[in-house]
A protein has these predicted regions:
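Class I S-adenosyl-L-methionine-dependent methyltransferase catalytic core
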Residues: 1-191
Length: 191
């Protein structure tokens, strides 16, 4: 796994997903699709990733100039990300949390100065809420309900192709969905 662009381009991320349970690694192909849609320059943009895993989406966004908020409830993955942030001296660009994703989003929503331009949602593929809703859909709904997105913001959701996300979730509308192997990458915007 490596950073594909920006100031950190070429750096290797020494993440071994066998050590971290249900964490998947986003392929360079999917990452290039996401960041191709976001654009090469992210200076002044703010990104959230409630299911950070290895942190690779956050590092890539920081490499391109974004301010980043990462969360992962798994203590081992959180520790791995914290070590990379320290080693690569990214503490001024990346805020890291270790809590339930819904509680974390609620906490972020309390700070009205932080509407986000970008969100990357990639929960464990088979994860569901206690009500039986896929966590990918529940997280999209929470982001919409908590007004966390800038009016021109966009959300990228990586999910299993077995889950078909609705065209509309609250104030969010799906603008694109493309298959990458066993994954779908769906994009949502307000409106």
């Amino acid at each position: 796994m490596r950073i594909i662009s920006g100031t950190l381009k070429g750096r290797r991320i020494p993440f071994n997903n066998r050590k971290f349970g249900d964490a998947r690694v986003t392929s360079d192909f999917v990452k290039e699709a996401v960041f191709g849609a976001m654009g090469p320059e992210l200076t002044g943009k703010r990104l959230i990733d409630p299911f950070a895993g290895s942190g690779q989406i956050g590092y890539e966004a920081a490499s391109r100039g974004a301010a980043v908020w990462l969360n992962d409830r798994d203590k081992k993955r959180h520790g791995f990300i914290r070590n990379i942030i320290q080693e690569w001296e990214l503490a001024d660009q990346i805020d890291l949390s270790n809590e339930d994703w819904h509680r974390w989003l609620k906490r972020l929503s309390a700070d009205a100065s932080l509407p986000f331009h970008l969100a990357y949602v990639d929960p464990p593929y088979d994860a569901v809420t206690p009500e039986g809703m896929p966590e990918s859909e529940a997280c999209l709904s929470a982001i919409a309900d908590l007004n966390l997105l800038n009016p021109d913001g966009q959300i990228f959701v990586q999910h299993t192709r077995r889950i078909i996300l609705p065209d509309q979730i609250g104030s969010l509308h799906q603008t694109k969905s493309k298959r990458y192997g066993d994954s779908l990458l769906s994009r949502y915007r307000l409106g």
